[in-house]
Amino acid sequence: MPNPGFRPSRRKSLARRTHRISGLVLAGTLLALPGLAAAEDLRTYAVTGDAIPHSLTGVAGDVARGRALVVERSSTCILCHSGPFPEQKFQGDLAPDLAGSGSRWSEGQLRLRLVDASRLNAATIMPSYYRVDGLERVGALWRGKPILSAEQIEDIVAYLVTLRQ
């Protein structure tokens, strides 16, 4: 027995609206990722021991911009880390507290942890923020692009080295 309330045209309209909304949500999500660096020529760097001793940009990063990136949820730092950010109510507890980072690690060690943490620990859940090769399950829009730019890496390093106990 056919359903008397069934109207195919209404169903198609709902499907179209749902599809449009999904597209808008996806577009909004992509726009909300300011940390996603634009396609750029990746700067070369040398790893010495457990560090990248030299700046990726050749200049020191900006401490204020680095702090802003760390506490910004879309850059993902405070989703896993906690730290001296009293204005942030919800901080992560999956990774080390960032307080005292500048006492525990050198500038070069912090830089390598941001660029490619998996080089130090293959089982890490921390993303490689500046590595683009050898990664698995990378979305088509992100292939060949670092999560953070070299400048953003240097800004975050500049901030983290100020966190001393």
Regions found by a protein language model. Give the residues of each.
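Boundary at the C-terminal end of the N-terminal hydrophobic targeting segment
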Residues: 37-39
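Short pre-active-site segment immediately N-terminal to redox-active cysteine/selenocysteine motifs
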Residues: 73-76, 152
